[in-house]
Amino acid sequence: LSDHFHAPHSKEYVRSFVDSINRPIVVSDFCKIVQGQVALEKEACLQARQQTCKLVFHDTNILSNLIYGSHYLEASAKDIETAGLGPGIGFIGQAPYDLYLFCQNDIPWKPEGRQRDSAQARDHLHEQFAQSLTNISALNATNATNAKTVLIHGSPETRLNLAINAVQACLETEA
C-alpha cells in the first residue's frame, strides 16, 4: 500500500526486536516493544508531514502490542501504564487513525518462529482484535471521529485491491 500510494509507512517493531534479542520475549520486554512501536509510528508521521503526504501507513499499531502482550505475556493494565500509555484502549481510541484494515484469517496459517505459535491462537487473537475494533468503533462514535474498519479477505490480490479501494474511499471522504 505504501508503494502504491507513494506514502511513508511504519513496520511492526516487535519483529525486529525479537530478531535482535534472539530469544522469546518476556513481560519485561513489553515496555520496550510498545515504546518502539510508538516511535516508528511517530517517525512515519513525521516523514509524511515533511513530504506533505496526506497518507501514512502503519503495518500495525499498539493495539496489536496490547492484544499480543495480553495473550502471550499476560501483560496487565499495570504493564500498559508502565509502558507510558495510560489506559490502553483510551490511547488507541484517541490515536489519529482514520482507517483500520482488518485482515481476516481466511488464508492458511504458517508458523513464524518465535511469533504466532498456532492456528488456534490465531483464531483466538482474531476474535480479540474483532472485539477491540468494535470497542474502538463505539469510542469513535461517541467522540465523533471518522475512524472506520474495513474487512480484508481473500487471495493476496483480492486483499490488495480491497485495501486500495478502502484507502481511496477514505481519501474521497476526507476531500
Please name every model-derived segment.
Residues 13, 60-61, 67, 104-106:
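Anionic group-transfer/hydrolysis microenvironments
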Residues 17-18, 155-161:
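A short acidic, often aromatic-flanked loop/helix-cap motif at beta-alpha or helix-coil junctions
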Residues 167-175:
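Short, hydrophobic alpha-helical segments
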Residues 73-136, 140-158, 171:
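A glycine- and Lys/Arg-enriched "phosphate-lid" helix/loop adjacent to the NTP-binding pocket
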Residues 31-95:
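Glycine-rich phosphate-binding loop used to anchor ATP phosphates in small-molecule kinases
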Residues 18-29, 66-75, 112-116:
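Surface-exposed cleft-lining segments at the edges of enzyme active sites
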